[in-house]
Amino acid sequence: DGKWIPIELKYTTKKCIKTINDEVYVLKEQGAKDQGCYNYLKDIMRIEEFRDKSNNFIEGYTIKITSEMSYLKPPTKVNCTYAEFSIEDGSIKTGCMNWATNTGKGTMRGMEAPIVLTGMYPINWKEYSKVDDTKSGTFMYLVNIISKKN
């Protein structure tokens, strides 16, 4: 009936090789947590922009699945360049977010624009799957709902 429910999915992994039920899984180290955080929030912004231009929007979803546990924690470096984009557990993302002034051009390439969110988005990570007790054996997920404007 012409209604829209956009969904953005991001999947980032920590390097690991696992054998489960005689099947071997090889996951690459994807790194670039700073860019991963930026891109997740950019997905929310993109769905908000779509919502604001469409009469057919119902609601939207952003989903991130990761085995990289550092996403759940606040940045550890004092001069962290992506602090405003951090999607650590328990945070709330809203408003205008920018890279720090000391961010390298290579890090920001193609991602120079600030992220501006009109809604408030709680960051609540949940366990998706636990393969084993190693650092790379747990997968977590994050879901945010972008609601229709009233």
Predicted features and spans:
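Well-ordered, non-membrane alpha-helical segments in soluble/globular domains
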Residues: 34-46, 79-86
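Non-catalytic C-terminal interaction segments of nucleic acid-processing enzymes
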Residues: 68-150
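Surface-exposed cleft-lining segments at the edges of enzyme active sites
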Residues: 23-38
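Residues at beta-strand starts and edge strands
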Residues: 3, 58-59, 137-140
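Low-complexity, flexible helical/coil segments
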Residues: 42-49, 99-102
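Conserved catalytic cores of phosphodiester-cleaving nucleases, focusing on short active-site segments
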Residues: 1-25, 47
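Nucleic-acid nuclease catalytic cores
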Residues: 48-79
